[in-house]
Amino acid sequence: MTETFFDKPLACREIKEIPGLLEFDIPVRGDNRGWFKENFQKEKMLPIGFPERFFEEGKLQNNVSFSRQHVLRGLHAEPWDKYISVADDGKVLGAWVDLREGETFGNVYQTVIDASKGMFVPRGVANGFQVLSETVSYSYLVNDYWALDLKPKYAFVNYADPSLGITWENLAAAEVSEADKNHPLLSDVKPLKPKDL
């Protein structure tokens, strides 16, 4: 859990390093039984800055990945927007890299995410995380349906690229897929044009 976990007011912050990347504080209510949160409620999120365009195509798919400590996933930019959060008592170190064409190409942001925080990640921004807790259930709500024919639209950057300056926890102990180990360095990534997003 982060330093302030329970009873934060619902709030949204724009991340200046990466336009469109939003960080949300999510109210978590706890007692002797555990805790409860509304992970996402459209009526409350839109007025504080959640993008209305997320719902334009009427497609929503919610995914949950389960990972163990030291697992590192990323960095992937899929052809959809996503709202990510942690669905249990776990904690991750999240990292994002702007792969969109423009002056913020290559900009990086990272923060720790637990159940009291959510992130809106616009398409074209690569997303990755490393598990800091014993396990974590990582939830991501996306605005398109997964389909194999969308794979060619994915973009990737290597999590260990020193030019990114990402500070991972104990990278030598990280459990990483072969695919993620072989993603290109930022210098070899072709910036994503608006028409490709």
From Swiss-Prot:
Is Mitochondrion there in the keyword field?
Answer: no
- A GO biological-process term: polysaccharide biosynthetic process
Q: Which Gene3D superfamilies match?
A: Jelly Rolls
Molecular function in Gene Ontology: dTDP-4-dehydrorhamnose 3,5-epimerase activity
Instruction: Name the domain of life.
Output: Bacteria
- Alphabetized Pfam families for the sequence: dTDP_sugar_isom
Identify one Gene Ontology CC term for this UniProt entry: cytosol
Transmembrane spans: none
Catalytic residues?
H76, Y140
Q: Which keywords belong to this entry?
A: Isomerase
Q: What EC number(s) has UniProt assigned to this enzyme?
A: 5.1.3.-
Its annotated function is as follows: Could catalyze a 3,5-epimerization.
Into which family does the record put it? Belongs to the dTDP-4-dehydrorhamnose 3,5-epimerase family.
Q: By what name is this protein known?
A: Protein RmlC homolog
Source organism = Streptococcus pyogenes serotype M6 (strain ATCC BAA-946 / MGAS10394)
Encoded by which gene? rfbC
